[in-house]
Amino acid sequence: MKTRIHVVQGDITKLAVDVIVNVTNPSLMGGGGVDGAIHRAAGPALLDACLKVRQQQGDCPTGHAVITLAGDLPAKAVVHTVGPVWRGGEQNEDQLLQDAYLNSLRLVAANSYTSVAFPAISTGVYGYPRAAAAEIAVKTVSEFITRHALPEQVYFVCYDEENAHLYERLLTQQGDE
């Protein structure tokens, strides 16, 4: 797994990967944080694609994921997932966060994409504690790629150095980095 999982500090919208994962709200209509940055970088085609998905299936439930084209992003596609809002840890948040990663990975693999970039799901305005979220992310992704050929490369994209070090430390502890 050492060569399959990477930590990158920077702007997820600039990565040349097959799929960028967008953390969105159930409406898929764009918002603040990473969601807003991805929508701005992708241009109006992404919002149009999200509107079509929403018209077909309605809101995207927490822990679920959908895939669309990537608009003006360097990626080929965007997987939109709804992470859980942190409510103290007693509202099934851990399982919902794991589901957000798993369902995103399943869409990447099902569409034969080889690389994916994840932001730190739910750690922004949704308030999930960073360390707990990183542990779930690393464990879930590591277990998935152990059992599946795709994606070949997974990137955890961290906005700041502190979060990047957190992911690097967890991967080192697992022997993955």
Swiss-Prot record:
Gene Ontology MF: a single term: ribonuclease inhibitor activity
Similarity comment: family membership: Belongs to the MacroD-type family. YmdB subfamily.
Matches recorded under InterPro entries: Macro_dom, Macro_dom-like, O-Ac-ADP-ribose_deAcase
EC number: 3.1.1.106
Reaction it catalyzes: 3''-O-acetyl-ADP-D-ribose + H2O = ADP-D-ribose + acetate + H(+); 2''-O-acetyl-ADP-D-ribose + H2O = ADP-D-ribose + acetate + H(+)
Protein name per UniProt: O-acetyl-ADP-ribose deacetylase
Enzyme active site: 35 (proton acceptor)
Keyword Hydrolase: yes
Positions of the Macro domain: 1-175
Listed SUPFAM superfamilies: Macro domain-like
Species: Shigella dysenteriae serotype 1 (strain Sd197)
Annotated keywords: Hydrolase
Oligomeric and partner information: Homodimer. Interacts with RNase III.
Any one Gene Ontology BP term: purine nucleoside metabolic process
Function: Deacetylates O-acetyl-ADP ribose to yield ADP-ribose and free acetate. Down-regulates ribonuclease 3 (RNase III) activity. Acts by interacting directly with the region of the ribonuclease that is required for dimerization/activation.
Gene this protein is translated from: ymdB
Annotated Gene3D superfamilies: Leucine Aminopeptidase, subunit E, domain 1
